[in-house]
């Protein structure tokens, strides 16, 4: 069984979550986990100006995803930073190129799940994931979130991401807050949970 983790990350926050998601999925027996980045759409000059180009070098080793690869997976976990309460433009551009897969129903019946990062505590974590689900539903995917059996999302002793819709983190307005132990645990749980659900469906 093959699980793909497909994401976009600017400063590395979503990348950290993606690693935790992949680790969780890989804990399930007979699961192949593949990590992929979606293509960058911003010009290099701008990326350098805002510090993204340098930050992305830390995970430049992760191969860029080809649209056709999605068809080979049994489950796909998508990671995106929030942009005004929606997925980022890079992810939107990538998904807009999946029309050919949609036309032949290539993703119908596959498991889909989403995780995210926002700049602020109420910066659109839930709306980003929920609006992302619309695209997955158009593809006929089976949506899996982060159930309350991950008890870390009920904590009130610290500021934390994660909701029943998916794992998340808060980067901070200066992008200087990194995923906490609890947020990474949520991402790990989500990866493992998706792999378990996919296993029940496809093995």
From Swiss-Prot:
Gene Ontology cellular component terms for the protein in this record: membrane
Domain Flavodoxin-like: 3-194
Amino acids binding NAD(+): 11
Keyword Hydrolase: no
Pfam families: FMN_red (PF03358)
The protein's required cofactors: FMN
Binding locations of FMN: 9-14, 82-84, 117-123, 138
Note on cofactor: Binds 1 FMN per monomer.
Sample GO molecular function, one term: NAD binding
The EC number(s) this enzyme carries: 1.6.5.2
Residues that coordinate or bind substrate: 102
Domain of life: Bacteria
Catalyzed reactions per annotation: a quinone + NADH + H(+) = a quinol + NAD(+); a quinone + NADPH + H(+) = a quinol + NADP(+)
Alphabetical keyword list: Flavoprotein, FMN, NAD, NADP, Nucleotide-binding, Oxidoreductase
NCBIfam families: flav_wrbA, PRK03767.1
UniProt family annotation: Belongs to the WrbA family.
Name listed for the protein in its UniProt record: NAD(P)H dehydrogenase (quinone)
Organism: Syntrophus aciditrophicus (strain SB)
Phylogenetic lineage: Bacteria, Pseudomonadati, Thermodesulfobacteriota, Syntrophia, Syntrophales
